[in-house]
A protein has these predicted regions:
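Short coil turns and loop connectors of transmembrane beta-barrels in diderm outer membranes
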Residues: 89, 93, 140-142, 154, ...
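Outer-membrane beta-barrel pore domains
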Residues: 48, 118-119, 156-159, 163-165, ...
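Membrane-embedded beta-strands of outer-membrane beta-barrel proteins
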Residues: 130-134, 175-177, 230, 263-264, ...
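Solvent-exposed loop/turn segments connecting transmembrane beta-strands
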Residues: 124, 140-141, 222-227, 250-259, ...
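N-terminal periplasmic/intermembrane-space "pro-region" immediately following the signal or transit peptide
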Residues: 2-7, 26-115, 426
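Glycine- and aromatic-enriched membrane insertion/assembly motifs of diderm outer-membrane
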Residues: 117-154
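N-terminal secretory signal peptides that target proteins for export/translocation
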Residues: 1-21
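Surface-exposed coil loops of outer-membrane beta-barrel proteins
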Residues: 104-125, 155-271, 275-284
C-alpha cells in the first residue's frame, strides 16, 4: 500500500502472530468490552469458568489436568494444531490505545476547543481511541488477505459524523479485502473501506501515528478522512509507484449522489533520504448533486537528512464548483501549507515542531461564511518508555485573522492549549 513512511522512530510493533486460542480470546474479549461500553457504559464482571465437577488442586490446575501424562498433552496439542486451517498461522492481531488530558486557556463555556479535530474536549480526561486490528497481510503476487480495524472512543464521532451525518463512538475505521495479481512486480487491489491517501498526517493506529498529539488544520479541514470503494496500486520500480481509486467520495459508506469520485497518487523516491507524494481526488461530493465537482491537490514531502532529524512539508489546494459562502454562485477555494521538524535527542526522547496556515477564502471549510485564515504552532516532546508505551506532552497556539475561536461566552482570535497523552501499542 502507498502510505507515507514513518516520520520518526516510533513505537514499532510487528503484527502479533500468537497462537490461535490466544488470538481468539484477545479478539473476543476486546470486542465484548467494546460492545459492553457502547451498550451500557460498564464492563461486565468476569465469570468463573471452572466446573464444580473438576475442582482445582493447590497448584491451580484441575485434578483432571494433573492426571494427564506429558506425552498425552503433547499428542493433544499436535492434533489440535493439525486440525486448524493453515491460514490461521497468518492471522495477526494488534491493538492501539490513546488517552489524554487537555486544557484550553480560553475556557470555552461549551467545553469544546474550536477547530480541533480529535482533541476538542477542554479540561477533560479522554479515551481518544481504543483500536483492535485483525488482518491477514497480502505481501506478494497471488496473495489474498484482509484487514479490519475496529475503533471506539471520543475521537470516533469526528469521523463517523460525516458518514450520513450520524455520529457514533464505534466505527469500522477500515475494512477491506486485498489481492495481489501476478502481473509484473504485483498489481495490488484493495476493496472496501480504507483511510485516505491524502495528507502528511494519518488516523492513528498500531502501525503508525503522528509526531504531534493534536491534528493539523489541513488534516481536519482540507482533505477527507476515509473512502469506500476500490483501488489499485503498482510499484514500477524502487523509486516510482502509483495508485488509482474509484470511491463513493469523502467519508461516505454509502454514496450521496449518482457520481463517483476518482483519486490518484504518484509516489517518488528520487534519493534514499527523500520521499515525495503527489495526491489528487476529484468528483461531486454534495448530496443529490452530480455537477458541483470538488477537487483537492495534495503534496507531501519527507526528508530525512540524518538518522535523528526528519523534515516534512504538506501543501493543499482545494476547489468546489458554485459553493462559495462569500460570493454565492461562485466557486469555493481553500489552501494551506504545513511544515514539520522532528529531532530525536536520544533513542527514547524526541521533540516535534509543527507550523501551518490555512486560508478558507470562501468560508466553506471552516464554516465561518467569511474569508478566514487560521494558523497554528505546536511543540510536542515525546518519551518512549518501552516499545509499547509512549508519553507525550504538547503546547499549541492558534491564531486567526478574525474572532472565530470560542472564549468563555464570546469569541476571540487566538487560543492556547496544553495536553498530555499516553499511547499503548501492541
Amino acid at each position: 500500500m502507498l502510505h507515507r513512511t514513518s516520520a520518526v522512530a516510533r513505537v514499532s510493533v510487528p503484527p502479533s502472530r500468537a497462537g490461535p486460542s490466544l488470538m481468539i480470546s484477545l479478539a473476543a474479549a476486546t470486542l465484548a468490552l467494546l460492545v459492553a461500553a457502547i451498550a451500557g457504559g460498564q464492563t461486565p464482571a468476569p465469570q468463573l469458568t471452572h466446573s464444580i465437577a473438576t475442582p482445582l488442586t493447590d497448584s491451580g490446575k484441575s485434578r483432571a489436568d494433573t492426571d494427564k501424562k506429558p506425552s498425552d498433552t503433547a499428542a493433544a496439542a499436535t492434533k489440535t494444531a493439525e486440525a486448524l486451517p493453515k491460514w490461521f498461522d497468518e492471522l495477526a492481531v494488534n491493538a492501539f490505545v490513546s488517552t489524554a488530558y487537555e486544557y484550553n486557556g480560553n475556557r470555552p463555556t461549551n467545553g469544546v476547543s474550536s477547530y480541533r479535530v480529535f482533541d476538542f474536549s477542554d479540561n477533560s480526561f479522554n479515551l481518544d481511541v481504543a483500536e483492535l486490528v485483525v488482518q491477514i497481510a497480502a505481501t506478494k503476487p497471488n496473495d489474498a488477505g484482509f484487514r479490519v480495524d475496529l475503533a471506539a472512543g471520543n475521537s470516533i464521532p469526528q469521523i463517523t459524523k460525516t458518514q450520513d451525518q450520524n455520529a457514533a463512538q464505534f466505527d469500522l475505521q477500515q475494512a477491506f479485502a486485498s489481492y495481489i495479481a501476478p502481473l509484473g512486480s504485483g498489481l495490488r487491489f484493495d476493496v472496501g473501506k480504507f483511510v485516505t491517501h491524502l495528507g502528511y498526517e494519518v488516523i492513528e493506529g498500531y502501525d503508525g501515528y503522528d509526531d504531534n498529539y493534536s491534528r493539523s488544520i489541513l488534516f481536519g479541514y482540507a482533505i477527507p478522512f476515509t473512502h469506500t470503494g476500490v483501488k489499485a496500486s503498482y510499484a514500477f520500480s524502487s523509486k516510482v509507484a502509483g495508485m488509482v481509486e474509484v470511491v463513493n467520495g469523502w467519508d461516505l459508506l454509502r454514496d450521496n449522489n449518482r457520481s463517483k469520485s476518482v483519486g490518484a497518487q504518484l509516489a517518488l523516491t528520487p534519493v534514499a533520504p527523500l520521499q515525495v507524494l503527489l495526491n489528487w481526488i476529484g468528483g461531486p461530493e454534495l448530496a443529490n448533486n452530480n455537477h458541483s465537482n470538488r477537487n483537492v491537490f495534495d503534496l507531501v514531502a519527507i526528508l530525512k537528512p540524518t538518522s535523528t532529524l526528519t523534515l516534512g512539508l504538506n501543501g493543499d489546494y482545494g476547489k468546489e464548483n458554485g459553493t462559495s459562502l462569500v460570493n454565492p454562485g461562485s466557486d469555493a477555494t481553500w489552501k494551506g501549507i504545513a511544515g514539520y521538524a522532528t529531532y530525536a535527542l536520544t533513542s527514547k526522547f524526541s521533540v516535534a515542531l509543527r507550523g501551518e496556515t490555512f486560508r478558507d477564502e470562501d468560508g466553506v471549510r471552516l464554516g465561518t461564511g467569511t474569508n478566514a485564515t487560521l494558523s497554528e504552532g505546536t511543540l510536542t516532546p515525546a518519551y518512549k518508555f518501552t516499545d509499547h508505551v509512549l508519553l507525550r506532552g504538547e503546547v499549541r497556539y492558534d491564531k486567526a485573522n478574525q474572532p472565530i475561536l470560542t472564549k468563555r461566552g464570546t469569541l476571540a482570535d487566538k487560543q492556547t492549549t496544553v495536553a498530555g497523552n499516553v499511547i499503548f501499542v501492541y
